[in-house]
Curated annotation (Swiss-Prot):
Membrane spanning stretches: none
Example of a GO MF term: tRNA pseudouridine(55) synthase activity
Top-level division of the source organism's lineage: Bacteria
Stated role: Responsible for synthesis of pseudouridine from uracil-55 in the psi GC loop of transfer RNAs.
Protein name in UniProt: tRNA pseudouridine synthase B
Class of enzymatic activity (EC top level): isomerase
EC number: 5.4.99.25
Organism of this sequence: Lactococcus lactis subsp. cremoris (strain MG1363)
A Pfam entry, by short name: TruB_C_2
Keyword terms of this UniProt record: Isomerase, tRNA processing
Similarity comment: family membership: Belongs to the pseudouridine synthase TruB family. Type 1 subfamily.
Gene: truB
Catalytic reaction annotation: uridine(55) in tRNA = pseudouridine(55) in tRNA
Gene Ontology biological process terms in this record: mRNA pseudouridine synthesis; tRNA pseudouridine synthesis
Length: 330
C-alpha cells in the first residue's frame, strides 16, 4: 500500500460513474485507502470531481462545503420523475410561442441570493432514517423540509432553441451555487416559475475548490501517469481544499502557537489576509492588512505559514472575539 501520497486530484468524472465508483477505482490505481471525494455528482453528470489523497482527506469537510460552478441545459415543456433526462415523463405542458428570452432571464434573476429549496425525492437526503430515493423507488412521496441554499449567479448562456412541433424550449445555463444545491431542482423550479413543467437535460461541473474543467483528468489518463511514475505532477497542494476560506498568513510567533493548537483573540492580530476567490478560480488573491479578525465575514479561515497550509481556525461558539483551531495540519 502507498500511504505516502498526499494532495488533491482534479478528476474528470465521466457519465455513468458514481462518485464512489471513482474513489474505488482510484484506490486500486494508487494502491491506497486514504481517498475521498469533495462533493457527490449524480451518475449522469460529468465534470470536476475533486479527490483528496492521503493526509489531505482530513480536509474533505471543507472541500464538500465549497461553492461549485456548473454548466448545463434546461428543457421546458415536460418534467420527469427524477428531474433530469434519465427519468420517466410525468407531466407535459407544451410551451406557447410567446415565451421570450427576456422573460426567462428575468425569472432566472429571481433565484439569485439566499433561497429555499426542497430536495428532490430522488436524492440521498435522509428523512426518518431512510434516503429519499428509497421512498421514491417504493412509489412514495413524502414531505421534505426546505433547505436554505445560496445562488451566486444563474444566467442563460445560449439563445433559446424552439421545438415548436413538440412545444419544447431548450437553452444552456451557468450557475454558481453553494453546497447542498440541487441544480436539477433549480431547473424544475425555474420552469415552474414560468408556468410550465421542465427538467434539467444536461449538466457538467466546471469548477470546484479552485479546480477547473480544462485541467480535469480522466481516470484512464491518471492510471497512465501513475504507471509512468509522474503522479506528483498532477497532485495539487492541500490548500486547494480550502480555496473558499479567507487566507491568513501567520507570523513566526503565531505559527508556534497554531502548531500546538492554541486559541487566538481577535485583538492580538495584525496580519496579511487574502480574500477567498469568489470565481472558484486559482488566481493571486487581493491582499490587505487587518488590525483584527473581526473584519472577516466567514466563520472559518485558513492559516498559512511560509506559504503552506498549517491550520483551519473557526470562531469560538461561546466566546466572543476568540478563534479556536478547527483542524491543525502540522
Amino acid at each position: 500500500m502507498n500511504e505516502n501520497l498526499n494532495g488533491i486530484l482534479n478528476v474528470y468524472k465521466e457519465a455513468g460513474w458514481t462518485s464512489f465508483d471513482v474513489v474505488a477505482k482510484l484506490r486500486g490505481i494508487l494502491k491506497t485507502k486514504k481517498i475521498g471525494h469533495g462533493g457527490t455528482l449524480d451518475p449522469s453528470v460529468t465534470g470536476v470531481l475533486p479527490i483528496a489523497v492521503g493526509k489531505s482527506t482530513r480536509l474533505l469537510e471543507y472541500m464538500e462545503a465549497a461553492g461549485k460552478i456548473y454548466e448545463g441545459q434546461v428543457t421546458i415543456g415536460f418534467s420527469t420523475e427524477t428531474e433530469d433526462a434519465d427519468g420517466a415523463i410525468v407531466n407535459q405542458t407544451p410551451v406557447k410561442n410567446n415565451l421570450t428570452e427576456s422573460e426567462i432571464d428575468s425569472a432566472m434573476s429571481h433565484f439569485v441570493g439566499k433561497i429555499k429549496q426542497i430536495p428532490p425525492m430522488y436524492s440521498a437526503v435522509k428523512i426518518n432514517g431512510k434516503k429519499l430515493y428509497e421512498y421514491a423507488r417504493a412509489g412514495q412521496t413524502i414531505e421534505r423540509p426546505a433547505r436554505e441554499i445560496t445562488i451566486k449567479s444563474f444566467v442563460r448562456t445560449s439563445p433559446i432553441d424552439w421545438n415548436k412541433e413538440e412545444g419544447l424550449v431548450t437553452f444552456s445555463f451557468k450557475v454558481e451555487c453553494s453546497k447542498g444545491t440541487y441544480v436539477r431542482t433549480l431547473a424544475v423550479d425555474l420552469a415552474d416559475s414560468l408556468g410550465y413543467a421542465g427538467h434539467m437535460s444536461k449538466l457538467q461541473r466546471t469548477a470546484s475548490n479552485g479546480l477547473l474543467i480544462k485541467d480535469a483528468i480522466k481516470l484512464s489518463k491518471i492510471e497512465e501517469i501513475k504507471e509512468s511514475g509522474k503522479l506528483s505532477t498532477i497532485l495539487y497542494p492541500a490548500e486547494y481544499a480550502v480555496s473558499d476560506l479567507p487566507r491568513v498568513n501567520l507570523t513566526t510567533v503565531q505559527f508556534d502557537m497554531a502548531r500546538v493548537g492554541k486559541k487566538f483573540a481577535q485583538s492580538d492580530w495584525t496580519n496579511e489576509v487574502e480574500t477567498a476567490d469568489s470565481s472558484v478560480n486559482k488566481t493571486k488573491q487581493q491582499e490587505y492588512l487587518l488590525t483584527d479578525l473581526s473584519l472577516l465575514t466567514t466563520e472559518k479561515f485558513a492559516a498559512f505559514y511560509n506559504d503552506k497550509l498549517v491550520a483551519v481556525y473557526m470562531k469560538h461558539p461561546e466566546k466572543e472575539g476568540i478563534w479556536k483551531p478547527n483542524k491543525v495540519l502540522v
